[in-house]
Amino acid sequence: SKWNINLKKLKEKPDYFIESIESMLRQTIKPDEIVIVKDGPLTPELDQVINKYANQESGLFKIVPLVKNLGLGLALNEGLKKCRNELVARMDTDDISLENRCELQLKEFEKDPKLSICGTMIDEFYDTPENIVASRIVPLKHNDIVKFGRRRSPFNHVTVMFKKNDVLACEGGYHDVHRKEDIDLFVRMVNGGFWGMNLNESLVLVRSNIDNFERRKSWANCKSYIKVIFDFWKRGYSRLSDLVFVVITQVGMFIAPTWLLRIVSNKVLRSERKTRM
């Protein structure tokens, strides 16, 4: 199977970036092309790492430099347009994919020609991949994905593999919505006639830390979330009760201290895990 990886790069520790790339090079079915979007100028250390891989793996890496920082959604669209294959796997530059992740996703696309997007569960870790602190569980079947998407993202963004042309056919792909590009795209897709599913396995290890909670409780983040769900309500994807729920929880999140947010996030929004299964 010929397939792509689409990565967006701005700020990252070089070591994390290397771990992420290596996890994709170890896939049981190798990618045909890895597209790295440089979203604005990078540090010399990161440039060095990217150049090393581009020289080492001739023809595998395609580097897309953007003159200025466009933000996640628009940068990913640029990368998507440059991908030469129809099937594209998303990956964050500090996360680790398990070796069979893409093979299992490719099998689903072979089984079901109408499938447009396939995600997986994630395990979140602190410091080392062995230190799993939580998992984010999402629904498996299309109809449950549509329902779940009324309030929350029904896919784990860093795990998805999708059909490039289906994404771009859905109102031009990613939109420029601050930190909520994933839920915005996915809910538009599954409500717009594109078929989705999630695999019932954690196939990506996601790096987490206290900064993630600080970002989630920023007013810009809360406002953006409310705006996206308001748009879903106007479109008829979400109900009024969903919008009210999101407004109350996002304002609560903004007001709540970080320690409380961390407890709620792990107990309610995610399932807590202490060891890797």
Predicted region positions:
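Glycine-rich, basic loop-to-helix element that forms the pyrophosphate-binding segment
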Residues: 66-83, 104
